[in-house]
Regions:
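Positively charged n-region of N-terminal signal peptides that target proteins for export
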Residues: 1-7, 13
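C-terminal motif of bacterial Sec signal peptides marking the signal peptidase cleavage site
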Residues: 17-21
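Bilobed "Venus flytrap"/periplasmic-binding protein-like clamshell domains
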Residues: 25-52, 56-57, 114-180, 298, ...
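Extracytoplasmic small-molecule ligand-binding "clamshell" domains
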Residues: 37-73, 79, 239-240
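An extracytoplasmic/periplasmic, membrane-proximal ligand-sensing/linker region
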Residues: 41, 169, 173, 180, ...
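Pocket-lining segment of extracytoplasmic ligand-binding domains
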Residues: 84-86, 94-96, 103, 124, ...
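Short helix-loop capping/hinge motifs at secondary-structure junctions, enriched
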Residues: 122-129, 258-261, 314
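Ligand-binding clefts/hinges and TM-proximal coupling segments of bilobed small-molecule sensing domains
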Residues: 135-152, 225-296
Length: 315
């Protein structure tokens, strides 16, 4: 009996080793809500990388950045899309992650810009960030990354939340409130163009406020996850001049438990299959190795670092 059990166990171990040698590991990817960009883009990337590597991808709809970091820390996912500012908070235990510090993840690659857009009603007499004092301003959902973006940008101009009539509204609710003259301005951190602002600009005059170079550089010095970003003229109806602002980055992070080889394989496939990814989702056009390593304030996973050094994106 014992001999037969030993033979069975040996066979099972050999079979498991065979499966391991054949590859086919499943990567659990956390994205965002199933109607959002994170989910659609993550699905597109998973499909392409699943075809181009020996990995398969299980795409999960989630509550986005903070939830995704918590899922990696809990060992429930292996790969996630997050904003690089929220990633910074988690790694350092600040802001959204005060008292909840986690360093169970590493950076893999920045993917695309999420632009800090400050939209104002020109009839409210707002032409600059300084003009927001005393105004009704939505700063995004309470406790969101957008709220912290708003807090940091305002503070760079000497304005606190006590200096405005702060409201916490979603992007679409903010756009509706501005249209109905219930607020004077709102903060929105998202790709540019983004639908809430595009829809608003088709029926209402809007102004998008500049973050000037001096204040932008001061913010970047304090918060290295920011980068300067120009919103091209014509991005929104009636906004006919370039707007200078800041952006954070939608970024892939990975569990520290993933092997160097697995993360190297994913990173390499991500950039070598840019055309196929772009065909599957328009955000693929922003994939760029040089951009992928800028404004990343946490360590890269050794597998990602190996790839970026190999192609000269990191020294």
């Amino acid at each position: 009996m014992k001999k037969r059990l030993a033979i069975a166990i040996s066979f099972l171990l050999a079979f498991m080793l065979f499966l391991s040698a054949c590859g086919g590991s499943t990567i659990r990817m956390a994205t965002g809500g199933n109607t959002g960009t994170y989910y659609a883009y993550g699905t597109a990337i998973g499909q392409v990388l699943g075809e181009k590597t020996d990995l398969s991808f299980n795409i999960q709809s989630t509550g986005a950045s903070k939830a995704n970091i918590q899922l990696i820390a809990a060992g429930e996912v292996d790969l996630a899309i997050v904003q690089n500012d929220v990633m910074d908070y988690a790694y350092k235990g600040t802001d959204l992650f005060t008292g909840e510090q986690t360093q169970d993840f590493s950076a893999m690659a920045a993917l695309y810009a999420e632009v800090c857009q400050i939209v104002a009603d020109p009839s409210a007499g707002i032409t600059s960030i300084e003009d927001l004092k005393g105004k009704n301003v939505s700063v995004g959902d309470a406790g969101s990354g957008v709220e912290f973006n708003a807090k940091q940008i305002l503070e760079a101009y000497g304005i606190t939340f006590d200096d405005i009539n702060k409201q916490n509204l979603s992007f679409s609710a903010s756009a509706d409130a501005l249209k109905d003259k219930k607020i004077d301005a709102f903060f929105c951190t998202a790709g540019a163009p983004t639908s809430a602002i595009t829809d608003l600009a088709t029926s209402n005059a809007i102004t998008i406020l500049n973050v000037d170079d001096e204040h932008a550089q001061a913010l970047i010095a304090d918060y290295p996850f920011y980068a300067q970003y120009p919103i091209p003229a014509g991005t929104y109806n009636g906004v006919d001049e370039e707007v200078k602002t800041l952006a954070v980055k939608a970024t892939f992070i990975v569990s520290n438990k993933l092997s160097e080889d697995t993360v190297y394989q994913m990173t390499k496939a991500l950039f070598e299959n840019k055309d196929a990814i772009t065909t599957a989702h328009a955000k693929g056009a922003e994939l760029d190795p040089a951009y992928a390593v800028e404004s990343i304030s946490v360590p890269f996973h050794p597998g990602a670092e190996k790839y970026f050094k190999e192609i000269g994106a990191l020294s």
